[in-house]
UniProtKB/Swiss-Prot annotation:
GO CC aspect terms: mitochondrion; oxidoreductase complex
Family: Belongs to the CIA30 family.
An annotated GO BP: mitochondrial electron transport, NADH to ubiquinone
Localisation per UniProt entry: Mitochondrion
Protein name: Complex I intermediate-associated protein 30, mitochondrial
The UniProt record lists the keyword Transit peptide: yes
Main location class: mitochondrion
Organism: Drosophila melanogaster
Subunit comment: Associates with mitochondrial complex I assembly intermediates during its biogenesis.
Organismal lineage: Eukaryota, Metazoa, Ecdysozoa, Arthropoda, Hexapoda
Gene ablation phenotype (knockout): Larvae are viable but most do not survive the late pupa/early adult stages. Surviving adults that are assisted to eclose display severe degeneration of myofibrils and mitochondria.
Length: 296
């Protein structure tokens, strides 16, 4: 009897531990993200509560303007009903006031990984000029293997009172831009940051080939040509870009195969277009993969 009681006590001690291991939902302990910057923490000091209150009161006037504009648009209720072929709706225009405040410039040097430099300013022609130097020399810390990049990206689209939202481009199937480059290839980035942590770094890419020289070029790229990547790696499981969940737009340039040196990309505008003759939904054929191999 005493031995049975001792076994029962041992079993009772183990039950709480067993109960803690029971989950009602699937748990992924292998891949997860601690934060949206994936380890690239901001170097700015954490503001005090007093400073946060002062900043909030300072921004209140601007937020009220955004809120009034939202209410006005809601009452007007005047959406675009007819998307005419050949007509470009400009989304990012560098002739607009305070346009540079809506973009963020980053390089490998910002994270202590390289020596590249970049800036975004208005050119003599009144367009946005993304230029600088890309350098593939990296810090000799035994961790960083490749570097030499520069990016520009729009700030997160939002509503009033710091509410995050997304662009809705579902009615369009073409990305149109007027650019003037230096002969380099640039990467077009469409960020579709998801709700779950594994989707925070989802970006759709396509390559922009520039001719160089003094002449402008009109690039017209179907959205069906964009491919999915995460943290710089092209994903095995691909799919059409969710055009109702675009959070950022940007360009990247890299120094590879001895292409260190200056770069320059002049951007007049970036717009959207509906082409009824383009019926393709996704350009890349997928193959059937076994279960438990790729994101299944």
């Amino acid at each position: 009897m005493n031995s049975l009681l001792r076994q029962g006590l041992r079993l009772g001690c183990c039950l709480p531990a067993v109960q803690q291991q029971i989950h009602t939902t699937a748990v992924h302990r292998t891949f997860w993200e601690r934060e949206k910057k994936s380890g690239y923490k901001t170097k700015l000091p954490e503001p005090s509560k007093k400073q946060m209150i002062m900043d909030g009161l300072r921004d209140l006037k601007e937020e009220m303007k955004l809120w009034r504009q939202e209410v006005k648009e809601q009452f007007e209720s005047d959406p675009i009903l007819v998307f005419r072929p050949g007509e470009t709706d400009v989304v990012f225009d560098f002739k607009a006031p305070d346009v540079l405040d809506k973009w963020t410039v980053t390089t490998d040097a910002d994270h202590g990984e390289g020596k590249s430099t970049a800036t975004l300013e208005l050119s003599a022609a009144g367009a946005g000029l993304f230029h600088g130097q890309v350098n593939s020399d990296h810090t000799k810390d035994g961790i960083i293997k490749r570097t030499g990049y520069a990016n520009i990206r729009t700030k997160r689209v939002r509503k009033s009172f710091k509410r995050e939202t997304t662009y809705d481009w579902t009615q369009y199937n073409m990305l149109v831009m007027k650019v003037r480059g230096d002969g380099r290839s640039y990467l077009i980035n469409l960020h579709t940051e998801g709700y779950f942590d594994l989707m925070w770094n989802d970006i759709y890419h396509y390559v922009l080939y520039t001719r160089g020289g003094p002449h402008w070029q009109i690039a017209k790229i179907p959205f069906s040509k964009f491919f999915l990547s995460s943290k710089g790696r092209v994903q095995d499981r691909q799919g059409a870009i969710p055009l109702n969940r675009v959070t950022h737009f940007g360009f990247s340039v890299a120094a590879k195969k001895g292409m260190d040196g200056p770069f320059g990309l002049e951007i007049d505008y970036v717009g959207l277009e509906y082409d009824p003759s383009h019926r393709e939904e996704f350009a890349y054929e997928m193959y059937q993969t076994p279960k438990y191999i790729v994101a299944t």
